[in-house]
Amino acid sequence: SDVCSSDLGAPVIRGREVHIGVSHCPGRVAVCISDAPCAVDVEPESRDFSRAASRYMSPAERALSDDPLLPAAVWCAKETLYKYAGRPGLDMLYDLHVEAVDFEAGVVVGRIADGEPLRLSLKRADGFIVVYIL
């Protein structure tokens, strides 16, 4: 088997009926492998997302929580949704939506354009936040 890239740059394992998702940031790599489409994003909790928040978070998303990690969780969720959708040209603000973030339960509810709600998992570990969908 070979690992190659799809037309969108996503990893593909040629010759295998599996799906793979990969994300990396300084200090961490996250990988998910599943028999169904999957995606993952990882970011350090210390990254400052607040300056760019208005470019990817709607007013409704900014009102979901007063947790200081909300911008990071929404960013990771939208990156995960973008990868999961597998469609080029989706806009982080207008096409990808986060409807709920529950840090305690580790659940994010998101939506791609006008599609059905999707349940994503959220984990925090060692100063990193990971959001994935299997």
Language model region names:
Residues S1-L134:
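Core catalytic alpha/beta fold that binds nucleotide/phospho-ligands
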